[in-house]
Amino acid sequence: MIRDTKQPIKVPAKPASRSGGKAKTVKPKTIKPKTSAKAAAAKPASAKGLKGVIAVAPPSFRRERALIKRGIWPIAGCDEAGRGPLAGPVVAAAVVLDPKRVPKGLDDSKRLSAEKREALFEEICATAQVSVVYASPERINRDNILRASLWALTRAVHALPDLPRHVFVDGRDRLATKCDCEAVIGGDGLIASIAAASIIAKVSRDRLMCKLAEQCPGYGFEQHKGYGVPEHLDALARLGPTVHHRRFFAPVAAAWQKIEGAPPPQIRDLFEADVTVEATA
């Protein structure tokens, strides 16, 4: 018979002695199940409502400082933005942070509000070396999104004022750079230099998509930044694709097929942008 180990186990009383003396009455003992150390440790947390709470530490500058102590400098972090949208370029950024002026609040750009990203963008550009490279939709169509992204990331590293001796890149793919390159999965949430690059890439691309929204009204680029949300798909079906849409995505390809005799237009393969920051009092 299988017992529920959570229920107390009652031990029956011993039978009365057959000797001439009086039988002693033994009260049944109650044995409580033992609580394991793990269960005991988990109990207070559960009682306080902390069960399932995971603390996420912000990116740090520790790995950069470890390399600096070994005499390795400059050290860059690089990341990209815009792999998944239906429209617009993929934007890569490389950043060399000043060890004495690492901005506070750095984090993966996806975990920050737009206002926080904008503020950090200004601070990073004012205190660090920054480069930004845009890979056009035409290059994405020709090479595929992965190759276009790696190409832009590599160009961003080589476009820095001083070629770094070591590069941290977000993801699993190392770059074909002239310096040592270390790929770090989830690096934008671990390494400060990569987090800074993710912010520069994200804000640069968002600003560009807002400019494209002025050139292509009706698509809502300023809202969804080219991602395949229902509003964008609806506009694509009504208005057709633009020169900024990526042809290999199924919704865009279907939209082109509806336009008889109209070949997809070609656009500039690459354009690089210098990050400019207006001086603030």
Curated annotation (Swiss-Prot):
Top EC class for this record: hydrolase
One Gene Ontology cellular component: cytoplasm
BP GO annotations: DNA replication, removal of RNA primer; mismatch repair
One matching Pfam family: RNase_HII
Subcellular location: Cytoplasm
Principal subcellular localisation of the protein: cytoplasm
Residue sites binding a divalent metal cation per the record: D79, E80, D170
Location of the RNase H type-2 domain: 73-261
Annotated segments matching region Disordered: 1-46
Composition bias type Low complexity, residue spans: 33-46
Keywords: Cytoplasm, Endonuclease, Hydrolase, Manganese, Metal-binding, Nuclease
Cofactors that this protein relies on: Mn(2+); Mg(2+)
Job description of the protein: Endonuclease that specifically degrades the RNA of RNA-DNA hybrids.
Protein known as: Ribonuclease HII
Taxonomic source organism: Rhodopseudomonas palustris (strain TIE-1)
Lineage: Bacteria, Pseudomonadati, Pseudomonadota, Alphaproteobacteria, Hyphomicrobiales
